[in-house]
Regions:
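Double-stranded beta-helix
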Residues: 39, 49-117
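Conserved double-stranded beta-helix
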Residues: 1-58
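Short edge-strand/loop segments of extracellular domains
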Residues: 9-11, 59-66, 134-136, 140-146
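Active-site-proximal flexible loops/turns
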Residues: 33-35, 67, 118, 147
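Short aromatic-enriched loop/helix-cap "lid" or pocket-rim segments at secondary-structure transitions
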Residues: 14-20, 54-56, 68-71, 121-123, ...
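Short, surface-exposed loop/helix-turn segments at secondary-structure junctions
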Residues: 20-25, 80-96, 121-131, 152-157
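Extracellular/periplasmic catalytic domains that process cell-envelope and extracellular macromolecules
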Residues: 36, 101, 131
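Non-heme Fe(II)/2-oxoglutarate
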Residues: 108-109, 113-207
Length: 207
């Protein structure tokens, strides 16, 4: 399981400078680098995902279009080391995305090849949200045996020291646009259950 950071939006109806930015339609899996199915991506919201607030939007069945996307986006092959790929503004998939409404605790899962984005809504009804407009956890799941011993060590250190990684749980590297937390000195490592320790990479039988 990935060690992603969270998506946090503050209410912006009365403070426009708080309005978050929408992400462009994109894939997190470059078909030139990782052809075929590799993992399951997901989103776990702690607040309702509504049209007024916005949230994850997906292009249905776009996970089956890797060959077509490669032919239309030559830069994917020219830059095969990059996973995050933005869909061309003129691509026919533009405008095909749909919002997935969710309630707190729902778990949205999708094929890692799926084209998707995070879209900010008008924020009309978020004025009643006293704390946050959106809080969602990105979750990616893949086979543990893909992670090397070095990666497992980095994952353990990340939990101990308060670091987040990209969507790819077996690579343990930073994500696009990652920033350092200003309050890192206040971070305290969590007390994990055995199941949680296994998800990070600990061999609980050896403890």
């Amino acid at each position: 399981m990935s060690l992603d950071g969270m998506i946090i939006w503050r209410p912006w109806s009365e403070k426009e400078d708080r309005r978050p930015g929408s992400s462009k339609l994109h894939m997190d899996q470059n078909p030139a680098k990782k052809p075929g199915f590799h993992c399951i991506q997901g989103m776990l919201p702690l607040y309702p995902v509504t049209p007024s607030v916005g949230g994850t939007m997906v292009v249905p069945r776009s996970h089956l279009m890797q060959a077509e996307l490669l032919s239309r986006h030559k830069n994917m092959s020219r830059e095969p080391d990059r996973d995050y790929r933005v869909i061309n503004p003129c691509d026919p998939l533009q405008g095909q995305e749909v919002l997935v409404p969710l309630m707190p605790g729902d778990l949205l899962l999708w094929d890692s090849r799926l084209v998707h984005c995070g879209r900010v809504g008008p924020g009309i009804d978020d004025v009643n949200t006293s704390t946050l407009a959106r809080a969602s956890m990105c979750v990616t799941m893949g086979p543990r045996d893909k992670a090397s011993r070095e990666v497992l060590t980095r994952r353990k250190n990340a939990v101990t020291e308060g670091w987040a990684f990209s969507h790819w749980p077996w690579e343990a590297r930073g994500s696009v646009g990652q920033v350092s937390a200003e309050q890192r000195a206040k971070y305290r490592a969590p007390q994990l259950s055995e199941d949680q320790m296994k998800l990070v990479g600990w061999d609980v039988s050896a403890l």
